[in-house]
Amino acid sequence: MCIRDRGDGYWFLDTGVPHYVEFTDDLEAVDVIGRGRRIRYDKRFAKGTNVNFVKVVGPGHIAVRTYERGVEDETLACGTGSTAAALVTHLAAQPSVTAFRIDVRGGRLGIAFDEPKPGIYTRIRLSGEARKVFEGSYDTANFQS
């Protein structure tokens, strides 16, 4: 995993899917849908990217709001986005912390990881409640092969 400080206010990494991470002091003031959509389709990210806005609440505690590509909207929680936010917070602001409490719109998540060498992350663990938020059906007669 390559975590890059882009030097112009954001970090970029891939936690299975690409994530843009930007810190903010006022998470509620961020236009997650408007800004998220612009960043998601920015030419710097040829295949698009998920967009995470992060507020550091305290030691080992962050809050995250995520605009998810594919969903094309803000989501209640994003596991790979919360992982990206925790790793970037560790690298940029809290190098001694390897377990984070993460507040998301849908509740609370936990991310923990090992760092056997600086910048090398292993045993990344995500915890949190899983809830059914939608039910639907697909008519496969309209699918094309």
Where are the model-predicted features located?
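Active-site proximal loop and beta-alpha junction motif in alpha/beta enzyme cores
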Residues: 4-77, 84-145
